[in-house]
């Protein structure tokens, strides 16, 4: 369904997303890392670490944070901000759960 | 045969300790016979409360198993009670009509639990808490019934109550006195304890006297003297113990409350001794274990004709963790006309400390909530220390490390450090100096010290520090594993074992992690420790694996992966090379490179292609990415080489096949060279083997990376089988004692080569370690094959989502 200002794209069934692990999702020209956290909520961020472009989808997840597998930068899945002592941020995306499915909203 | 007949009546802790002491003095002097009324070998009765809690198995509390009796030529009769001693003819008679002559006799009949002489005490569901049978009764009842009543709010009753709570029962504790544990605590500490235990879920009925146990065949409730009553499906009587003097009395041996003994544990009848709870010494029959171990020592020396100081009675100290609450009491702890107290009471933190003085001498102490000062105060009480020089309040403050003198430095080697297990200072020093123990954990494993209540651990550490001096690195033992916790690696591993924890999330939860889901440091570490401790049952937590180990491939900087198939010993053939070549072409893999480990690396494979690449290769994973065995490099060796004295390729391949996939604290690299020219570079490997004429040399702790280190010569062996066996023992010891992410080089520097050698030279330890290693190896499966069989996991990990909007 498309309306004027907001696009909603289906990523898949929520039960198909592995828990506390990332999934690489390609939408148009974007590459996202989508995480299903242990509390069942969904987070999506761009799949590139601001340090050297590492793939965040493969990182270890703890609570609301993911650790980049390349050099262990710690990134918030809430607001995309890289935690001290490092600096930077990643783009975050909004997601929506409807019934059995997860949607990306942008 | 010439040996004297020694008969022990009673197979419990005190009696058997006396036998152990006798054996250590005069192994072959006596022909020993033991009679035990219970059907079990010698076990630690005190740990029954842990069995009740579900924490521990019966076999874990066994002090001496059936083998011990055989190994020491002791004739053991279980399930047999001695009913009479014929002091004239020097024989004992049992209920199986057996007549056993003796030259020397020891009575160690222990205590009988006191059962209230009230109507209903013989109903089903009413039990004491003395032996394994009682414990089984309580465990069985907890599965069927809900309400438990414990009569007796002393030490034993509270331990029983804690156990029953753990089993899911509703527990009420009935006590005659106005506060709990009045034998060990004063009113203030007793009430603090009650508050704590009520928070844990226990209900208390104080100043209540039970008049009748009501019910039909089975108990249904209790009725009290004041007319009130409660319901109960299980009643545990923990109202006290009485020395078991029946045998003594029936045989004409003088008894009072207990069997009367002198300062050398002799009864009034020649050649008959008594020890333990059944004995009465200077009017006291002891119910705690530390004095009984002291008695056993004196008895043994006296019986063997060795000069010994007489037993003069014990100053009692109790250090307990009742239900997780720290409680300590020692000496004479109640105030009176001549005895005055100094108290510190912190209501906010729930800490209460009191010392009792007679004039300027410290005679007693009670600590609640923080009992870390217990050992120091007890030492002062035993020495009848004069405190006139010390400022009053500072007695109760912990002394700083430099300012205070160490407690243990002033102790003689004979003095007992661990009261629960009767371990002396000398025994601990021996363990350090002769057996190479260099941590409290190792001393615990070697001597048993600090393995029960744990209260003596600070003293054990002190002795370690003094004995090892600058070699003792306290900080290595205490470093927290990451910022999420204050616990060190040893502490975490201990807790996992003690509490039977089985998932990373459970560990972080139960041990109070600051962050509930940990961090990139501790999650993989916990996953490793859990799997190391329980290899067959633990289910690996893939979310706690670093990406390489989760994907079973090496991630590259651009998000592609490298694939390294197994090439045992660096040996290949045309079939495998053709398979590899075909796969490279089919998947257009950009880079093919030889690795340092003597195999082929296919670099630049896309994530979603990995399962198909593995399927087409049809070779096992080379684990080039893991905290595991990497490779066993080899030189050509005697199969072709002019110089090789041994077949290095065959041994290398055997080693790699045996240990592939083993989870280790960090990567392990091995090599086998066929002669000292060392073409396989065995000198810089975690475990390197070098062939010599007639055998192999094993080198350990080498490292060819950032911290270059030459390996140390561990040992020389003759056969391939020995190499495999000792490699297994060595690696298992590394797995069990190293910190996660500690290479063998760092670990070996820390624990010391001679210590490792002493472990490997101990046949018993070798057997145990190899047993655990083989158990671990038995569950290994090739991960690439696994993925091919588990389509769902493959999809979750390797497939990307590509949407169409």
UniProtKB/Swiss-Prot annotation, chain A:
Keywords: 2Fe-2S, Cytoplasm, Iron, Iron-sulfur, Metal-binding, NAD, Nitrate assimilation, Oxidoreductase
Induction statement: Positively regulated by TnrA under nitrogen-limited conditions. Induced by ArfM.
Catalytic reactions on record: NH4(+) + 3 NADP(+) + 2 H2O = nitrite + 3 NADPH + 5 H(+); NH4(+) + 3 NAD(+) + 2 H2O = nitrite + 3 NADH + 5 H(+)
Domain of life: Bacteria
GO cellular component: cytoplasm
Main location (coarse class): cytoplasm
Summary of the function given for this chain in its UniProt record: Required for nitrite assimilation. Required for activity of the reductase.
Assembly behavior: Associates with NasD.
Protein name according to UniProt: Assimilatory nitrite reductase [NAD(P)H] small subunit
Origin species: Bacillus subtilis (strain 168)
Gene: nasE
């Amino acid at each position: 369904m498309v309306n004027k200002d907001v696009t909603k794209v289906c990523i898949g069934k929520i039960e198909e997303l592995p828990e506390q692990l990332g999934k690489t999702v390609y939408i148009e020209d974007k590459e996202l890392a989508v995480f299903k956290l242990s509390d069942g909520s969904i987070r999506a961020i761009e799949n590139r670490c601001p340090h050297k472009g590492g793939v965040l989808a493969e990182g270890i997840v703890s609570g609301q944070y993911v650790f980049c597998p390349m050099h262990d930068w710690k990134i918030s899945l809430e607001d995309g901000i890289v935690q001290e002592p490092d600096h930077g941020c990643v783009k975050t995306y909004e997601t929506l759960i409807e019934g059995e499915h997860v949607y990306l909203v942008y | 045969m010439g040996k004297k007949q020694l008969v022990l009546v009673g197979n419990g802790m005190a009696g058997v300790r006396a036998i152990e002491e006798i054996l250590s003095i005069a192994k072959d002097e006596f022909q020993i016979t033991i009679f035990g009324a219970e059907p079990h070998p010698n076990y630690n009765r005190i740990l029954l409360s842990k069995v009740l809690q579900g924490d521990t198995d019966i076999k874990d509390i066994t002090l001496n198993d059936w083998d011990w009796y055989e190994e020491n030529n002791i004739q053991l009769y279980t399930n047999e009670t001695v009913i009479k001693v014929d002091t004239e003819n020097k024989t004992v008679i049992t209920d199986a009509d057996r007549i056993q002559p003796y030259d020397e006799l020891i009575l160690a009949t222990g205590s009988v639990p006191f059962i209230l002489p009230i109507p209903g005490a013989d109903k089903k569901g009413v039990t004491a808490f003395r032996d394994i049978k009682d414990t089984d009764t309580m465990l069985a009842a907890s599965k069927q019934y809900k309400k438990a009543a414990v009569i007796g709010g002393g030490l034993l009753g509270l331990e029983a109550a804690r156990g029953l709570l753990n089993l899911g029962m509703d527990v009420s504790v009935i006590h005659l006195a106005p506060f709990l544990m009045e034998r060990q605590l004063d009113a203030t500490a007793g009430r603090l304890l009650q508050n704590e235990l009520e928070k844990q879920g226990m209900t208390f009925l104080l100043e209540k006297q039970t008049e009748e146990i009501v019910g039909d065949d089975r108990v249904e409730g209790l009725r009290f003297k004041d007319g009130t009553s409660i319901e109960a499906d299980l009643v545990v009587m923990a109202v006290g113990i009485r020395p078991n003097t029946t045998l003594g009395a029936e045989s004409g041996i003088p008894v009072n409350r207990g069997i009367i003994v002198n300062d050398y544990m002799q009864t009034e009848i020649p050649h008959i001794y008594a020890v333990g709870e059944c004995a009465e010494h200077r009017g006291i029959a002891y119910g705690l274990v530390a004095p009984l171990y002291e008695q056993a020592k004196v008895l043994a020396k006296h019986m063997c004709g060795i000069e010994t100081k007489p037993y003069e009675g014990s100053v009692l100290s109790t250090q307990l963790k009742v239900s997780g609450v720290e409680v300590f009491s020692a000496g004479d702890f109640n105030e009176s006309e001549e005895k005055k107290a100094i108290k510190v009471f912190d209501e906010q933190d729930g800490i209460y400390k009191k010392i009792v003085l007679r004039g300027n001498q410290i005679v007693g102490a009670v600590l609640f909530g923080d009992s870390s000062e217990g050992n120091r105060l007890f030492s002062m009480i035993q020495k009848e220390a004069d405190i006139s020089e010390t400022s009053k309040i500072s007695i109760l403050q912990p002394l700083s490390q430099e300012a205070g003198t160490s407690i243990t430095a002033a102790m003689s080697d004979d003095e007992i450090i661990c009261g629960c297990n009767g371990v002396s200072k000398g025994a601990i020093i021996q363990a350090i100096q002769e057996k190479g123990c260099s941590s409290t954990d190792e001393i615990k494993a070697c001597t048993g010290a600090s393995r029960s209540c744990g209260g003596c651990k600070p003293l054990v550490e002190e002795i370690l520090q003094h004995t090892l001096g600058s070699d003792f690195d306290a900080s290595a033992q205490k470093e927290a594993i990451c910022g999420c916790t204050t616990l060190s690696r040893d502490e975490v591993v201990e807790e996992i074992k003690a509490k039977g924890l089985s998932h990373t999330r459970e560990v972080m939860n139960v041990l109070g992690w600051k962050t509930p889901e940990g961090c990139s440091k501790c999650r993989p570490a916990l996953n490793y420790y859990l799997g190391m401790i329980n290899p067959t049952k633990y289910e690996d937590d893939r979310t706690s694996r670093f990406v390489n180990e989760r994907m079973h491939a090496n991630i590259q900087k651009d998000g592609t992966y490298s694939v390294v198939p197994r090439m045992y010993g660096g040996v290949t053939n045309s079939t495998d090379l053709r398979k590899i070549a075909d796969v490279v072409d089919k998947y257009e893999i950009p880079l093919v490179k030889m690795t340092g480990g003597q195999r082929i690396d296919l670099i630049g494979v896309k994530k979603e292609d990995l399962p198909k690449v593995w399927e087409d290769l049809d070779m096992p994973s080379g684990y080039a990415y893991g905290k595991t065995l990497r490779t066993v490099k080899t030189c050509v060796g005697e199969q072709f080489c002019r110089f090789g004295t041994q077949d290095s390729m065959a041994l290398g391949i055997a080693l790699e096949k045996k240990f592939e996939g083993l989870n280790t604290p960090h990567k392990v690299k091995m090599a086998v060279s066929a002669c000292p020219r060392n073409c396989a570079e065995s000198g810089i490997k975690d475990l390197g083997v070098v062939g010599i004429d007639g055998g192999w040399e094993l080198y350990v702790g080498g490292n060819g990376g950032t911290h270059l280190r030459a390996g140390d010569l561990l040992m020389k062996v003759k056969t391939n089988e020995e190499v495999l066996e000792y490699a297994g023992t060595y690696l298992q010891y590394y797995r069990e004692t190293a910190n996660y992410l500690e290479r063998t080089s760092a670990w070996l520097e820390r624990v010391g080569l001679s210590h490792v050698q002493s472990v490997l030279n101990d046949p018993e330890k070798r057997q145990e370690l190899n047993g655990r290693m083989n158990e671990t190896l038995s569950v290994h499966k090739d991960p690439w094959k696994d993925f091919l069989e588990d389509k769902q996991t493959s999809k979750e990990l390797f497939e990307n989502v590509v949407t169409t909007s």
